[in-house]
């Protein structure tokens, strides 16, 4: 029977009772099995059919013990061929009908069906009817069933399908922990609708059987298992059917939808409130930041926009907007100068203080506890004019011969020594007295406690003596005057005291506060008195330092030592320096690899006021740079990187900018000569002194440009730099070129000059610069001629017959025509003849004929002065010292 292609499908659901239900009666009586066949015939509206009884067995109807129940259902006229609407009876009517036709189930333990069993069957049937009534499908859900659809993964008899009713047979399924038997039970009643694909296939065979391979049982009876296989467990009801979706009321749906919308709106409101609260907090923070702008900030000559905003507690975008209003397009990482930063800060009522490189990256140190302070040795600096006996005095104190190691007998390095006296240790710093070492003397005065001013009794006060006094006063340190060379016959101590008193150094015996000591370094006179005076002054100063904190000090000198690398001479001012300490010296960082004292002995630690040499620097610091130990090497490297970055920015600002105005000035003034120099020295202090001395030689016509200056030997890179930069001159001060550099210099024809005394280097460079200058042209009178007669020659003009009074007359020389003591014409000789022949020159006492260019008014008795133009070498001192023009910065306006 084709279900899909008929309008009146007859659905027959058959179930076979299981063998477990066919138990023998105990009384020996036999009951015939009864089978209930339910036929549902669907007719159109208004028509009816009589109930028909049919038997599937070979024996006929009533003889086989069957009961036939006919149920008539009407279908609506509007039903489609593939759809059936089922009109269910009321629960009470169905219950009565079930009571009439319900069979009595057999009990295994009883021979005949008892009233109690019958009552149980009625009760179970009633429960099934109630469940069916509760879960009956609506017409809309029945109409939507597609009988042709097949589910590929659903086997026949799968009771997990949705919409399956609970009025089915009970199979004897095994009771195992893994599941309820090996298969689903058969179906006792026919299904009205909601067939799955597997159920439709099981019914389409036209047999009354379950959806598995077992035979269907009667209504309410369990069916047989497939192929008469017994179950492993007792009888057990089938699995509960899946619930049929019940149509919800619109009111309930609307309530739930309203509740869901309300929850969504509540979430949105909460999110909006959260973001509004967050925005308010941000605005409050911004207002707080605006109110927390400091009254004063410290910056360097340049600062990035982000760093300035951080110092002012502002956003970088706000400052960028201000700069855009000023016509400057910058980014947050771009640097601006101090003037621009000052203008920006003034808009927020904030003052700007410009600090140095090291103040910007200062390492904060802890304050000293007075209980931890201990006495330290004094640091004494010996200063004075050159050749006044400073180093000789120190040699006499140290009982050594230091000056013999200096070239030219003058000190060109700052030396630091520790001397043990009967009153304790004293640290001496010996500074150069030559005028080229001004910076060295200034640094010596900064790191000292007492200044010993050495003045020669025979020379008196000299320019460097006055300079040393000024350095000591700037450093605010006391001065002890040591009058040296008092053993000389021409020594005049009173003259020295008088001159120094005029400069503000009044002797104690004259009522002042300056101590004077007369000494003789050559004969070692008065040295003990000098040491006692130093110790007395140190006792008055009460010099103390902390020995337990991180070491701090100053770099006195630095150099590159072959085999040891960068060597820095430092003096410890506070704390204790130990091997392995990470530190920062200037813009470079490092770790102390070794410590040496002033005698070259390796030591483990250095205490305050002790001068030492240390190894382990990454680069060579400048003399006078601060030295400080950090807590870790990482901190030292961070500070070093920051200082190097700021140093590079400062150097880039110092580069001269080529502007259109500068170009016009250069064209107008003519080409300026330039001598390029590379300076290499043994120590950084000497290199600095030589560089400053050479740069002072520049004039308006020639300029000396130091393109590179550093300590160390002359290497290949120096030669290549000189060759690439217009054959610059290399000056080596107390250093020599390496063999490779010397060979490369010969190939590239680079001039290398080596010096051991600084003033010799300055003199030779001055001569080289003078040789580059164009010579001066001067007039020199070489002869005097008297005009005794004149002749007119056609096409030539007037010729003067002359007599040479003195000197000589040369062809093409200049001539001045003097008449009555007045120069009436200045010109050039056009012709010179001796009789009729041309002559190159005519000596005194001879006659000659002279013609003058463009001049025919020559007369008798005129005097002719013969002039020769000669070249005279120029001196740098003849011209005004060069003053570098001010560089106009971009963005500045000039008054017109």
Swiss-Prot record:
<dbReference type="InterPro" id="IPR023115">
    <property type="entry name" value="TIF_IF2_dom3"/>
</dbReference>
<feature type="compositionally biased region" description="Low complexity">
    <location>
        <begin position="168"/>
        <end position="177"/>
    </location>
</feature>
<feature type="binding site">
    <location>
        <begin position="484"/>
        <end position="487"/>
    </location>
    <ligand>
        <name>GTP</name>
    </ligand>
</feature>
<feature type="region of interest" description="Disordered">
    <location>
        <begin position="877"/>
        <end position="896"/>
    </location>
</feature>
<feature type="region of interest" description="G4">
    <location>
        <begin position="484"/>
        <end position="487"/>
    </location>
</feature>
<protein>
    <recommendedName>
        <fullName>Translation initiation factor IF-2</fullName>
    </recommendedName>
</protein>
<feature type="compositionally biased region" description="Basic and acidic residues">
    <location>
        <begin position="19"/>
        <end position="34"/>
    </location>
</feature>
<dbReference type="GO" id="GO:0003924">
    <property type="term" value="F:GTPase activity"/>
</dbReference>
<dbReference type="InterPro" id="IPR015760">
    <property type="entry name" value="TIF_IF2"/>
</dbReference>
<dbReference type="InterPro" id="IPR005225">
    <property type="entry name" value="Small_GTP-bd"/>
</dbReference>
<dbReference type="InterPro" id="IPR000795">
    <property type="entry name" value="T_Tr_GTP-bd_dom"/>
</dbReference>
<keyword id="KW-0963">Cytoplasm</keyword>
<dbReference type="Pfam" id="PF04760">
    <property type="entry name" value="IF2_N"/>
</dbReference>
<dbReference type="Pfam" id="PF11987">
    <property type="entry name" value="IF-2"/>
</dbReference>
<feature type="region of interest" description="Disordered">
    <location>
        <begin position="1"/>
        <end position="260"/>
    </location>
</feature>
<dbReference type="GO" id="GO:0003743">
    <property type="term" value="F:translation initiation factor activity"/>
</dbReference>
<dbReference type="InterPro" id="IPR027417">
    <property type="entry name" value="P-loop_NTPase"/>
</dbReference>
<comment type="similarity">
    <text>Belongs to the TRAFAC class translation factor GTPase superfamily. Classic translation factor GTPase family. IF-2 subfamily.</text>
</comment>
<keyword id="KW-0648">Protein biosynthesis</keyword>
<dbReference type="Pfam" id="PF22042">
    <property type="entry name" value="EF-G_D2"/>
</dbReference>
<feature type="region of interest" description="G3">
    <location>
        <begin position="430"/>
        <end position="433"/>
    </location>
</feature>
<comment type="function">
    <text>One of the essential components for the initiation of protein synthesis. Protects formylmethionyl-tRNA from spontaneous hydrolysis and promotes its binding to the 30S ribosomal subunits. Also involved in the hydrolysis of GTP during the formation of the 70S ribosomal complex.</text>
</comment>
<feature type="compositionally biased region" description="Basic and acidic residues">
    <location>
        <begin position="85"/>
        <end position="136"/>
    </location>
</feature>
<dbReference type="Pfam" id="PF00009">
    <property type="entry name" value="GTP_EFTU"/>
</dbReference>
<dbReference type="GO" id="GO:0005829">
    <property type="term" value="C:cytosol"/>
</dbReference>
<dbReference type="InterPro" id="IPR006847">
    <property type="entry name" value="IF2_N"/>
</dbReference>
<dbReference type="InterPro" id="IPR044145">
    <property type="entry name" value="IF2_II"/>
</dbReference>
<dbReference type="InterPro" id="IPR053905">
    <property type="entry name" value="EF-G-like_DII"/>
</dbReference>
<feature type="region of interest" description="G2">
    <location>
        <begin position="409"/>
        <end position="413"/>
    </location>
</feature>
<feature type="binding site">
    <location>
        <begin position="430"/>
        <end position="434"/>
    </location>
    <ligand>
        <name>GTP</name>
    </ligand>
</feature>
<dbReference type="GO" id="GO:0005525">
    <property type="term" value="F:GTP binding"/>
</dbReference>
<feature type="domain" description="tr-type G">
    <location>
        <begin position="375"/>
        <end position="544"/>
    </location>
</feature>
<feature type="binding site">
    <location>
        <begin position="384"/>
        <end position="391"/>
    </location>
    <ligand>
        <name>GTP</name>
    </ligand>
</feature>
<keyword id="KW-0547">Nucleotide-binding</keyword>
<feature type="region of interest" description="G1">
    <location>
        <begin position="384"/>
        <end position="391"/>
    </location>
</feature>
<dbReference type="InterPro" id="IPR036925">
    <property type="entry name" value="TIF_IF2_dom3_sf"/>
</dbReference>
<dbReference type="InterPro" id="IPR000178">
    <property type="entry name" value="TF_IF2_bacterial-like"/>
</dbReference>
<keyword id="KW-0342">GTP-binding</keyword>
<feature type="compositionally biased region" description="Low complexity">
    <location>
        <begin position="56"/>
        <end position="66"/>
    </location>
</feature>
<keyword id="KW-0396">Initiation factor</keyword>
<dbReference type="InterPro" id="IPR009000">
    <property type="entry name" value="Transl_B-barrel_sf"/>
</dbReference>
<feature type="region of interest" description="G5">
    <location>
        <begin position="520"/>
        <end position="522"/>
    </location>
</feature>
């Amino acid at each position: 029977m084709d279900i899909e292609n008929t309008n009146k499908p007859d659905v027959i659901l058959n179930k076979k009772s299981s063998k477990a239900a066919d138990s023998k009666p105990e009384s020996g009586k036999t009951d015939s099995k009864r089978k209930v066949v339910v036929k549902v015939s669907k007719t159109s509206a208004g028509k009816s059919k009589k109930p028909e009884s049919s038997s599937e067995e070979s024996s006929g109807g009533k003889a086989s013990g069957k009961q036939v129940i006919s149920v008539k259902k009407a279908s609506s006229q509007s039903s489609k061929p593939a759809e059936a609407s089922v009109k269910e009876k009321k629960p009470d009517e169905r219950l009565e009908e079930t009571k009439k036709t319900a069979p009595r189930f057999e009990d295994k333990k009883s021979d005949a069906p008892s009233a109690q069993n019958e009552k149980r069957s009625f009760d179970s049937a009633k429960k099934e009817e109630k469940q069916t009534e509760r879960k009956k499908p609506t017409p809309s859900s029945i109409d939507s069933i597609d009988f042709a659809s097949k589910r590929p993964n659903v086997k026949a008899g799968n009771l997990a399908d949705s919409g399956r009713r609970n009025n089915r047979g009970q199979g004897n399924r095994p009771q195992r922990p893994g599941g309820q038997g090996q298969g689903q039970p058969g179906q006792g009643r026919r299904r009205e609708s909601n067939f799955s694909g597997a159920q439709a296939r099981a019914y389409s065979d036209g047999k009354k059987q379950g959806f598995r391979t077992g035979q269907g049982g009667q209504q309410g009876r369990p069916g047989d298992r497939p192929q008469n296989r017994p179950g492993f467990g007792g009888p057990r009801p089938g699995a509960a059917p899946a619930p049929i979706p019940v149509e919800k009321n619109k009111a309930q749906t609307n309530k739930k939808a309203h509740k869901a919308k309300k929850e969504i709106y509540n979430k949105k409101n909460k999110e909006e409130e959260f973001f509004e609260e967050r925005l308010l907090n941000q605005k409050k923070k911004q207002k707080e930041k605006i109110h927390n702008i400091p009254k004063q900030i410290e910056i360097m000559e340049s600062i990035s926009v982000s760093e300035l905003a951080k110092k002012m507690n502002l956003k970088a975008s706000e400052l960028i907007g201000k700069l855009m209003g000023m016509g400057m397009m910058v980014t947050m990482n771009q640097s601006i100068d101090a003037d621009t930063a000052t203008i920006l800060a003034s808009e927020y009522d904030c003052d700007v203080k410009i600090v140095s490189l090291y103040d910007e990256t200062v390492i904060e140190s802890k304050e000293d506890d007075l209980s931890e302070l201990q006495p330290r040795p004094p640091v004494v600096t010996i200063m004075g004019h050159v050749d006044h006996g400073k180093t000789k005095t120190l040699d006499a104190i140290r009982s050594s011969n230091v000056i013999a190691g200096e070239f030219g007998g003058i000190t060109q390095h700052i030396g630091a020594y520790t001397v043990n006296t009967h009153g304790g240790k004293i640290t001496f710093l010996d500074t150069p007295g030559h005028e080229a070492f001004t910076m060295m003397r200034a640094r010596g005065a900064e790191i000292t406690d007492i200044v010993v001013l050495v003045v020669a009794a025979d020379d008196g006060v000299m320019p460097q003596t006055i300079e040393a006094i000024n350095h000591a006063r700037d450093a605010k340190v006391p001065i002890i005057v040591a009058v040296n060379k008092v053993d000389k016959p021409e020594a005049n101590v009173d003259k020295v005291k008088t001159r120094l008193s005029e400069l503000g150094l009044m002797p104690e015996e004259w009522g002042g506060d300056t101590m004077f000591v007369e000494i003789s370094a050559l004969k070692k006179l008065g040295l003990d008195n000098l040491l006692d005076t130093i110790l007395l002054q140190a006792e008055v100063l009460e010099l103390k330092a902390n020995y337990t904190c991180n070491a701090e000090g100053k770099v006195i000198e630095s150099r590159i030592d072959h085999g040891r690398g960068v060597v820095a001479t430092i003096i410890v001012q506070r704390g204790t320096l130990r091997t392995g300490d990470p530190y920062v010296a200037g813009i470079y960082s490092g770790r102390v690899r070794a410590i040496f004292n002033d005698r070259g002995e390796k030591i483990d630690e250095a205490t305050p006021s002790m001068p030492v040499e240390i190894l382990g620097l990454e680069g060579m610091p400048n003399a006078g740079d601060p030295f400080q130990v950090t807590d870790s090497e990482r901190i030292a490297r961070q500070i070093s990187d920051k200082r190097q970055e700021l140093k590079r920015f400062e150097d880039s600002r110092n580069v001269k900018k080529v502007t259109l105005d500068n170009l016009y000035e250069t064209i107008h003034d003519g080409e300026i000569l330039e001598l390029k120099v590379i300076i290499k020295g043994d120590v950084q202090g000497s290199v600095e002194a030589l560089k400053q001395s050479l740069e002072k030689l520049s004039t308006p016509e020639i300029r000396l440009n130091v393109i590179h200056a550093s300590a160390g030997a002359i290497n290949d890179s120096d030669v290549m730099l000189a060759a690439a930069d217009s054959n610059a001159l290399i000056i080596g001060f107390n250093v020599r070129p390496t063999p490779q550099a010397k060979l490369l210099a010969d190939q590239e024809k680079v001039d290398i000059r080596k010096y051991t005394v600084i003033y010799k280097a300055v003199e030779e460079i001055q001569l080289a610069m003078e040789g580059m200058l164009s010579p001066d042209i001067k007039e020199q009178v070489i002869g005097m001629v008297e005009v005794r007669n004149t002749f007119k020659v056609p096409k030539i003009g007037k010729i003067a017959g002359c007599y040479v009074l003195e000197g000589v007359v040369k062809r093409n020389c200049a001539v001045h025509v003097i008449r009555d003591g007045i120069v009436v014409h200045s010109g050039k000789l056009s012709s010179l003849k001796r009789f009729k022949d041309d002559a190159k020159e005519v000596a005194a006492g001879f006659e000659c004929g002279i013609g003058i260019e463009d001049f025919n008014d020559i007369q008798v008795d005129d005097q002719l002065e013969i002039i020769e133009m000669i070249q005279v070498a120029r001196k740098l001192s003849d011209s005004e010292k060069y003053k570098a023009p001010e560089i106009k910065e971009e963005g500045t306006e000039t008054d017109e």
